[in-house]
Amino acid sequence: MARLLEYYRDTVTKELTQKFNYKTVMEVPKITKITLNMGVGEASTDKKIIENAVSDLEKISAQKPVVTKARKSIATFKVRQGYPVGCKVTLRGVKMYEFLDRLVNVAIPRIRDFRGIQVKGFDGRGNFNMGIKEQIIFPEIDYDKIDKVRGLNITVTTTAKTDQEARALLSAFKFPFKN
């Protein structure tokens, strides 16, 4: 079992129950899924770019990504319907908690000039979005073997009803938010 899953069951549920006065443990918000999305705009001209992005995301998430395709043609971006434009992975269960552990304890401290995560990433319904500018902050990516530095979006979907509950949940998992 993942270390953070045990930590959630033992510590986080008790903290949040006291803080928000929940009547049952089932009311305590939990993380349902984490989605990693890597948009690759240059993939329409070169197929090798999308393959490299897929391999990077597979190393980061330890799960095979799905290639996302353009929904409609846009002439100004030289994109046709059905062209690959990125890749994404949805993590749930044990793999989700293992990725969250690596993200908070290893990857985020490796970000250059890091001063905390912006709080404006919450969407009003208890979900959190953050962007990462370089995939090289993850230890699974070998700096010498990458062709280009790419960013990715991380979406943390929770069962929290408000942003305050979601922020308390993620803070309990040691997310370093700005004050």
From Swiss-Prot:
Task: List, alphabetically, the Gene3D superfamilies matched.
Answer: 3.30.1440.10
Q: Fetch the InterPro entries from UniProt.
A: Ribosomal_uL5, Ribosomal_uL5_bac-type, Ribosomal_uL5_C, Ribosomal_uL5_dom_sf, Ribosomal_uL5_N
**Which Gene Ontology molecular-function terms are recorded?**
rRNA binding; structural constituent of ribosome; tRNA binding
Record keywords, A-Z: Ribonucleoprotein, Ribosomal protein, RNA-binding, rRNA-binding, tRNA-binding
Q: Does the keyword tRNA-binding apply?
A: yes
List the signal peptide residues.
none
Alphabetical GO CC annotations of the entry are:
ribonucleoprotein complex; ribosome
- Output the GO biological process annotations, alphabetical, semicolon-separated: translation
Instruction: List the Pfam families hit by this protein, alphabetically.
Output: Ribosomal_L5, Ribosomal_L5_C
Quaternary structure note: Part of the 50S ribosomal subunit; part of the 5S rRNA/L5/L18/L25 subcomplex. Contacts the 5S rRNA and the P site tRNA. Forms a bridge to the 30S subunit in the 70S ribosome.
Protein purpose? This is one of the proteins that bind and probably mediate the attachment of the 5S RNA into the large ribosomal subunit, where it forms part of the central protuberance. In the 70S ribosome it contacts protein S13 of the 30S subunit (bridge B1b), connecting the 2 subunits; this bridge is implicated in subunit movement. Contacts the P site tRNA; the 5S rRNA and some of its associated proteins might help stabilize positioning of ribosome-bound tRNAs.
Provide the family line: Belongs to the universal ribosomal protein uL5 family.
Q: What is this protein called?
A: Large ribosomal subunit protein uL5
